[in-house]
Structures are given as structure tokens and as C-alpha cells.
């Protein structure tokens, strides 16, 4: 470690795919920057830069947080990460889908980006074992722009579904994960084993301080990911897990009419849980009691409603678990919360939304939601245009008046600037077709949220 010049020894081997994890708990001072590097048999890594959280009782003048999500390797290049590496940031929040569990699957993508397709060790298009997940992480982390961004800033990671399998959930009847689009669906023991292997690969390749038991044989005992981080007294961030404990999708596990574009009444069932009972209590109570100037909630999936009349566009988000969302909002409204900042991803879109008890105009605001755009993964505009079925951003904004804006046709990243007075959201489009550190980039949107004033331009 620099600048003190301390040396920390750690080992590695095939049991962790030759990856290294060095936990420096209690060895660093709060609120300061550090440089670090790795040395092995005379070979020295590039120098990395990080910083520790501000200590309790301090009020930083400002925080700048990078927001990214959904970085499918085969759907574009990582020029946005080269730009992110050069930003002045206190941390990067990765809102899930660090990898996608497939490669070269002709059902999903045509080869557009040279050098981005590869076959998994199993020969399958979808990951079916630990070796496949490890190969995916090695491929993604081979990208030089991702390496630069990881070395430039400290990161906070949460996962979504593609670190394991698309639209995954927990099935309480089989005590195993569900994965509606995976060939192991209907085979609970195989899915349970695969989940354990996906979790293991995640801990090997993703630098996150989580509770992990490598010998556990049940996913919920193996890892607990939800946690809280305090940036002094300015922002307390509640990092949630919206995949490991959630109920099956309320309208069924099919596509159109069930997981997408659904109308079933089960969406409002009190039995539908996104968080599970224990995580729900942890979030509801601790966020309500937080003394921080701003209370941050990271949700891998969209928190606010996205509907067209009676049609729910995506039951994989909180709309499929609406009763639990309503219970949280009611509790926070009774507690007088007005400084909530929700950070979300998953939808391959960017948006800003009013957060209020029923999301109706004129209500007192609890806070605002800001969604990070996908880094490379195709957005709904790109996907639905192939089906000649893209209604447009304006249609979705009109159908959902709580939205300040919706952009389903953007790739890039966002920056959140937090001060005691306001939260500012800067949205950047970056051309994913250019494999260069200076890939074209432009500011697409700039908003701020202030309690009592709502969302404003600027």
C-alpha cells in the first residue's frame, strides 16, 4: 500500500481461479486516498487508486458517484469506461449485470462487434458450471478500459440476474432458485448447485465485502450481499439484493403477457416479496431511522411504476411486487422521509422519477429515483424496433406522469453529485460502437432534486 508503503501478503491458487482478495478492514484511515499495486515474483501490476469512506460525524462538501449497469460484452465496446476512469469520483456504484451468463447465443445477438464473441468451456451458449462463469469473468475483465476504471476508483457492487441466469427468483416450494430461460429450469437441485457456483465466481472476480461461506451448500447460507455504507453524515447507502429472496413472477414465467406486458391481479398480492422478510425489515427500519442528510437506496431493478393503463410493462421490476413497495412507501411517508434517493438499473434505459406514496402528481415527495443507462446492452428502443413495436419515449412519459423523463435509446453512464443542499444527476451518452478511449460522448441530461422542490433541470 502507498503512501505508507505497507506490504500485505496474501495467497492464491486454483481453488479461487488464481484470483486474490485482500481485505484491509481496520488497516486504513477513514476519509483519505490510497494508491496500491500487486507484486508477484518480480512482476508488478499497474498502480490502482482508491479512497476510504468519510468517518461518522463529518459532512463532506460533496460526493461524486459514477453509476453504471448492464455491460454485456458482446453488445458493444467499453469506451464509456475509459471516460469513467477519467472522471473525478469518490466511488462507482455498479447496479448489476456485471456479466451476462451467455456468449455467442444466436437467439439473442448477431455478431456486430469484432473480438467480443467467445465460446464457453462447456460448449454451451449459457453458463452451466463454475468453469463457464469463471470464463465469462475472465473475458469481461480482459477489457483494458474496464481494467482502467476498476483501478481508478473504489467500487460498490450489487448483482442483478445475469450474474446467474435471466429473471432469476427464489422458489419457496423447491427451496431453490428459478431461472425461466435456463435449460436447468424445473431441475431444482441442478439450479441450486449452479447458483452456488455463480456466487463463488462472483466473489472471486468482484471486489465486494460481503458475508461469504465457501463451504455452505445452500445459497442463502453461502452469501448475504445486502449491506449499508455511510459517506460521513452526507449519504447513507442501503445496498439491497433484489434477486436472492424474491418470489416467482406474479403472472407466470412466460414472456409477453406474463413477465412483460401483464395484467394479472397477483401483482398486488401481499404474498409477493422482492426482498424476503428479513431484508425487508432491515431496509424498512434502518432507512427510516437513518440520520444522514440523504438516504440512498440501490435497487438493481426499477423501483417506480412503469405502466400503460392497466398493463404492467415489466413484472420483473418492483411493479411485480407492488404491495411490498407500497408498504415501504407508507412506512417512510409516516416517518416524514423526504430525502430518499433511489438508484436503479436493469431496464437498459435512463430515467428520473418522482417517488411519493402513490406516485401521483401533487403528492408530497419522499425523494427521487435515478436510473443508470446500460453501458452496452441494447435498450428497449433497439430491441422493440426489431419487432416494429417501439412506442417511443414520449408515450411512456405521458403514460407515467411521475416520470420526469424516460430514455430507452441510450448507452453510457451517469454521475450523481451529492451536496447537503441537492442531488444532481448527469447522464452521458457514449458511442458503444467505437473501441477507443475517446469514443464520442455527450451530456444527454442534467437534473437536480431538492426536498420541497422536486426534480428540476440544471
Report residues per predicted region.
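Metal-dependent phosphoester/phosphodiester hydrolase catalytic core
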Residues: 1-458
Amino acid at each position: 500500500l502507498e503512501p505508507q508503503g505497507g506490504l500485505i501478503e496474501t495467497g492464491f491458487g486454483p481453488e479461487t481461479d488464481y484470483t486474490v482478495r485482500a481485505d484491509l478492514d481496520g488497516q486504513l484511515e477513514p476519509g483519505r486516498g490510497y494508491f496500491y499495486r500487486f507484486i508477484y515474483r518480480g512482476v508488478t501490476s499497474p498502480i490502482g487508486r482508491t479512497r476510504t469512506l468519510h468517518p461518522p460525524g463529518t459532512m463532506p462538501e460533496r460526493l461524486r458517484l459514477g453509476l453504471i449497469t448492464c455491460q454485456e460484452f458482446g453488445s458493444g465496446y467499453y469506451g464509456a469506461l475509459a471516460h469513467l476512469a477519467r472522471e473525478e469520483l469518490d466511488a462507482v456504484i455498479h447496479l448489476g449485470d456485471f456479466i451476462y451468463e451467455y456468449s455467442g447465443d444466436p437467439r439473442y445477438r448477431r455478431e456486430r462487434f469484432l473480438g467480443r464473441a467467445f465460446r464457453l468451456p462447456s460448449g454451451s451458449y449459457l453458463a452451466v458450471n463454475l468453469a463457464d462463469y469463471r470464463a465469462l469473468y475472465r473475458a469481461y475483465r480482459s477489457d483494458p478500459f474496464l481494467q482502467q476504471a476498476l483501478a481508478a476508483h473504489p467500487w460498490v457492487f450489487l448483482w442483478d440476474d445475469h450474474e446467474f441466469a435471466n429473471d432469476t427468483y427464489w422458489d419457496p416450494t423447491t427451496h431453490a432458485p428459478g431461472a425461466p430461460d435456463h435449460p436447468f429450469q424445473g431441475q431444482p437441485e441442478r439450479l441450486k448447485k449452479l447458483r452456488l457456483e455463480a456466487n463463488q465466481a462472483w466473489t472471486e472476480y468482484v471486489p465486494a465485502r460481503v458475508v461469504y461461506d465457501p463451504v455452505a451448500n445452500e445459497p442463502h447460507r453461502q452469501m448475504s450481499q445486502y449491506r449499508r455504507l455511510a459517506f460521513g453524515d452526507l449519504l447513507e447507502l442501503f445496498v439491497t439484493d433484489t434477486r436472492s429472496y424474491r418470489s416467482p413472477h406474479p403472472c407466470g414465467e412466460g414472456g409477453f403477457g406474463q413477465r412483460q406486458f401483464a395484467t394479472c391481479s397477483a401483482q398486488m398480492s401481499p404474498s409477493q416479496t422482492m426482498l424476503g422478510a428479513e431484508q425487508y425489515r432491515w431496509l424498512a427500519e434502518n432507512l427510516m431511522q437513518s440520520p444522514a442528510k440523504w438516504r440512498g437506496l440501490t435497487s438493481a431493478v426499477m423501483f417506480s411504476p412503469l405502466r400503460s393503463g392497466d398493463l404492467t410493462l415489466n413484472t420483473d421490476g418492483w411493479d411485480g411486487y407492488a404491495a411490498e413497495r407500497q408498504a415501504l412507501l407508507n412506512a417512510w411517508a409516516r416517518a416524514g422521509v423526504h430525502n430518499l434517493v433511489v438508484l436503479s438499473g436493469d431496464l437498459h434505459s435512463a430515467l428520473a422519477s418522482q417517488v411519493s406514496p402513490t406516485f401521483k402528481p401533487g403528492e408530497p415527495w419522499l425523494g427521487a429515483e435515478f436510473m443508470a443507462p446500460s453501458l452496452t446492452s441494447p435498450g428497449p428502443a433497439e430491441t422493440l424496433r426489431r419487432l416494429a413495436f417501439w412506442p417511443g419515449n414520449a408515450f411512456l412519459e405521458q403514460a407515467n406522469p411521475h416520470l420526469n423523463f424516460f430514455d430507452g435509446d441510450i448507452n453510457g453512464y451517469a454521475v450523481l453529485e451529492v451536496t447537503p443542499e441537492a442531488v444532481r444527476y448527469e447522464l452521458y451518452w457514449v458511442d458503444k460502437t467505437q473501441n477507443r478511449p475517446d469514443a464520442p460522448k455527450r451530456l444527454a441530461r442534467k437534473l437536480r432534486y431538492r426536498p420541497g422542490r422536486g426534480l428540476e433541470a440544471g
